[in-house]
Amino acid sequence: MIPLYMSERSMADITLISGSTLGGAEYVAEHLAEKLEDGGFSTETLHGPLLEDLPNDGIWLLITSTHGAGDLPDNLLPLYEELKEQQPDLANVRFGAIGIGSREYDTFCGAVEKVETELKSCGAQQIGETLKINILDHDIPEDPAELWLAEWENLLKTD
């Protein structure tokens, strides 16, 4: 049975999920959505969604920053907790992941690692390697994300 909220939403090729405190991951998500649309994909960008906001199949692209001691942004924490507690069946979800953080901390990109772990434990399959952007090396995180996206798009086409 398809939940009511699923039948009411439009289906995008790729759902971008951002977790951000200061807006950096949101900017990256919006930039990548534009690039994906230029490449012929339809997208939906959700900033800090709940589990019920997400399709239970298809392709997700997670973009999140890390704060404090490997902490998730406040707007992504509810989704992470839902994944951990509910363990939904995400066997029909494939995902890519981008983390933004500072190598000054030993928990560099800890937030993306936490969400990745939960997605995989729910059966989601990762496409490609996770991009971890060190903000000390990249003033504009959209730049390395765009380079990574080109490779990731090729993986989507061959998958």
Where are these regions (language model features)?
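A short, well-structured beta->alpha microelement
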Residues: 37-52
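FMN-binding flavodoxin-like domain, especially the glycine-rich phosphate-binding loop
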Residues: 7, 12-13, 18, 23-30, ...
